[in-house]
């Protein structure tokens, strides 16, 4: 099998994990590195990259042309609307959904002095910093994890925010502050590796063996809630679902770009019929003003 992926250290680590799991199933695979528009436009904030997913488009194009058999993506990078004949055939077990702060001269974000600069390329993380740490300032940061850590060490930032799962996959044992997911609500599908295939192909059937059912259910619920508010990477929105037995604890939150306004819904829903219940949670977010906040954020960023 031919696995298509981006060329960053993190993307290669994710693809290598899939290749290793396939080998354990007796399936040999090779890795093909593909440059995406998200890799090329390194100086643009992520919210300025419009259209079909900046980090997945070119890889999916090659998948559709049968030049690779599988694509390995971070699930949160995959748009809600996508080519009909591509499917997410499997998701691997989620290692962590949490955001973490890597801080230069303090133990916690709360210990940083007023005016300290926090690096993030996410409108969601920036809005949550403004809400929970109003004395701090955010500044856009791009580049791979190594580049961001170097910028932190060089003093361009006092702290940077990253996904914990990425640090785990890269084998980086850093001193971090793990941010409470019920205050600092993660992005929908954060921390999940997805394997995409052409619908109805033998490859799609083979990789189904790697699917983690609990992660599949949790991420499906998160995705439905986010879709109800058209919550792409532009919107300051977090959605986090955790399954415990036959129930799923769900929290959805939308913020204004400055973090001052917040719409939040938290509920426990049953696993049985969870997709319909997720739609209801999304509708509650909309009725509470979440869609209005999301639309205002999009308009402000388009100016």
From Swiss-Prot:
GO terms for cellular component: cytoplasm. It is an enzyme of class 2 (transferase). It catalyses: 4 porphobilinogen + H2O = hydroxymethylbilane + 4 NH4(+). Pathway: Porphyrin-containing compound metabolism; protoporphyrin-IX biosynthesis; coproporphyrinogen-III from 5-aminolevulinate: step 2/4. GO terms for biological process: protoporphyrinogen IX biosynthetic process. It comes from the Archaea. The modification S-(dipyrrolylmethanemethyl)cysteine is found at residue 233. It holds the Pfam family Porphobil_deamC. Keywords: Porphyrin biosynthesis, Transferase. The keyword RNA-binding does not apply. Binds 1 dipyrromethane group covalently. Its EC number is 2.5.1.61. The porphobilinogen subunits are added to the dipyrromethane group. Tetrapolymerization of the monopyrrole PBG into the hydroxymethylbilane pre-uroporphyrinogen in several discrete steps. PANTHER family: PORPHOBILINOGEN DEAMINASE (PTHR11557:SF0). This is Probable porphobilinogen deaminase. It comes from Methanocella arvoryzae (strain DSM 22066 / NBRC 105507 / MRE50). The gene is hemC.
């Amino acid at each position: 099998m031919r696995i298509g992926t981006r060329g960053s250290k993190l993307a290669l680590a994710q693809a290598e994990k899939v290749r290793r799991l396939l080998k354990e199933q007796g399936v040999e695979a090779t890795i093909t590195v593909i440059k995406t528009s998200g890799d090329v436009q390194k100086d643009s904030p992520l919210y300025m990259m419009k259209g079909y997913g900046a980090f997945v488009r070119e890889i999916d194009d090659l998948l559709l042309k049968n030049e690779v058999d599988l694509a390995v993506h971070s699930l949160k990078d995959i748009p809600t609307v996508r080519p009909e004949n591509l499917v997410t055939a499997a998701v691997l077990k989620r290692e962590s959904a949490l955001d973490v702060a890597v801080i230069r001269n303090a133990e916690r974000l709360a210990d940083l002095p007023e005016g300290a600069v926090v690096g993030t390329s996410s409108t969601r993380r920036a809005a949550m910093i403004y809400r929970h740490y109003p004395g701090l300032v955010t500044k856009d940061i791009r580049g791979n994890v190594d580049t961001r850590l170097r910028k932190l060490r060089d003093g361009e930032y006092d702290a940077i925010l990253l996904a914990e799962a990425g640090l785990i996959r890269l084998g980086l044992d850093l001193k971090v502050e793990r941010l409470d997911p019920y205050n600092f609500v993660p992005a929908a599908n954060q921390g999940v590796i997805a394997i995409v295939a052409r619908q109805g192909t033998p490859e799609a059937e083979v990789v189904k063996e790697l699917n983690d059912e609990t992660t599949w259910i949790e991420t499906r619920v998160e995705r439905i809630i986010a879709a109800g508010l058209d919550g792409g990477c532009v919107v300051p929105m977090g959605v986090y679902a955790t399954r415990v037995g036959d129930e799923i604890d769900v929290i959805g939150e939308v913020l204004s770009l400055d973090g001052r306004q917040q719409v939040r819904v938290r509920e426990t829903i049953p696993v049985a019929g969870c997709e319909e219940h997720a739609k209801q949670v999304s509708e509650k977010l909309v009725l509470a003003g979440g869609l209005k906040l999301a639309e205002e954020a999009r308009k402000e960023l388009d100016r």
